[in-house]
Amino acid sequence: MAKALPIMFQGTHSDAGKSIIATAFCRIFAKNGWKTAPFKSQNMSLNSYVTVDGKEIGRAQGIQAEAAGVVATTDMNPILIKPSREHESQIVVHGKPYKNMQAFAYRGEFFEKGLAIIHESLDVLMNEYDRLVIEGAGSPAEINLNDRELVNMRVARMANAPVVLIGDIERGGVFASLVGTLQLLDKEDRKRIIGVIINKFRGDLALLKPGLDWFEQYTGVPVLGVVPYLEDLHIDAEDSVSLEQMSTAVNPDKDIDIAVIRYPKISNFTDVDPFLTEPDCHVRFVATAAQLGQPDLLILPGSKNTIEDLLYMKKNGIAEQIAQLNKHHRVTIVGICGGYQMLGARIRDPFGVETPLREISGLNLLPIETTLERKKTTVLSEGILTFTGERFFVKGYEIHMGRSQPLDGNIPFIHVQGRAEGAKSKDERVIGTYFHDLFHNDAFREALLNKIRREKGLAPIYGRQSFRTIREQAFDRLADHVKRHVCIEEIEEKMYMFQRRDV
């Protein structure tokens, strides 16, 4: 390994803010003229990102690459773990499915292979880039797992990277979690910690100052920054932990009520992110029939286990309520990927890809049937769709292990390079597609929202802001925010100094 200067961000626990701080540093380094790459050796997430060559990586690393202004590759996240069943996950290696494994088997059988994969990817990135922003996972102090971990201090050693430890003050007990983490680290690993960042701070910094002084005196580790909580950031969330903060209640101050079904194996829920930026929309994630209500737009998102999530909706009454909404109310229903499969007549699983159940009836709102297959499709796609009498060019990505066949009466939704994709009802109130990022297409999103507005007797809104522009602005806003509250120059100096010392 040679060229790149590395820095690694680890946290005291999951959702401490590692991904967002890493994203900020990708942007900061890139704007300072350094060719920068993100890296996460092993990511457990159901939010995916498809690279230009049709490979699947964690969504966070794809977004971090965008923040850095570089093209995402599988070397940036060579191992992706996608939970599919209880205690079982699909292991994705360099963007392609490797095999389904239970946690114990993965830990026992995959370790040496994983080490080789990670080392190879690190070698590629270290030789191609000037800066490498590495993200850990969970906590580096998981003493029951550390003998065979593949994502925290072992990666720091492989990359010879200094580590910044991040603590989340919003949860409380930040000093205890920081001190406890430091004390549980091996002596040599503790030497890699060049400082800590306290994240998600709310309140008066003067009240925190005595604690910062005590921490530095007690541990000898400098506090490199205290980052205030940043509202309405509009950068893709790493995992479903973020959904805990989403409202389930209707907001009467917003014109359009959007409900997203939050089934247990929800995936790629970032598909709805553009609606979070629309001033007239309120997005709710709902898990029960009682929470569903009568939304204007109902979205069935992706699922890592479509059959189990469909059974979940049938058992708790959501499926029946969807049928009643479709029959008696003017709701628009959109299913994406697994949600699209659920809208059909039936789903077959002849190979037991998801469950021992070989067939299940769907919601029967679209004339399609789906067969789950062993081979996964991962591809960037583009095509033409017709909606409200207009034609729209749309881009998206597909990640699915099923093939949906049209039945009598099917109307395709998108025409993609000579093939028909998706389905819609004659009145365009029910739509299904494999296209993730469908709503990221600004013109179509505007047409969909204006159709709903007209049906509610509201004037249409034209000239909505481009979501890509909003996200680019969000990267800059995040970078500026972190630069104001973190000692960037001190961190860079420590990065250089670290490479000159023996650890």
Swiss-Prot record:
Belongs to the CobB/CobQ family. CobQ subfamily. CDD domains: CobQ_N, GATase1_CobQ. InterPro entries: Class_I_gatase-like (IPR029062), CobQ/CobB/MinD/ParA_Nub-bd_dom (IPR002586), CobQ_GATase1 (IPR033949), CobQ_N (IPR047045), CobQ_synth (IPR004459), GATase_3 (IPR011698), P-loop_NTPase (IPR027417). One of its GO terms (biological process) is cobalamin biosynthetic process. Keywords: Cobalamin biosynthesis, Glutamine amidotransferase. The keyword ATP-binding does not apply. One of its GO terms (molecular function) is ABC-type vitamin B12 transporter activity. It holds the Pfam family CbiA. It comes from the Bacteria. Catalyzes amidations at positions B, D, E, and G on adenosylcobyrinic A,C-diamide. NH(2) groups are provided by glutamine, and one molecule of ATP is hydrogenolyzed for each amidation. The keyword Lipid metabolism does not apply. It comes from Geobacillus sp. (strain WCH70). Residues 255-444 form the GATase cobBQ-type domain. This is Cobyric acid synthase. Pathway: Cofactor biosynthesis; adenosylcobalamin biosynthesis. NCBIfam families: cobQ, PRK00784.1. The active site is at 337 (nucleophile), 436.
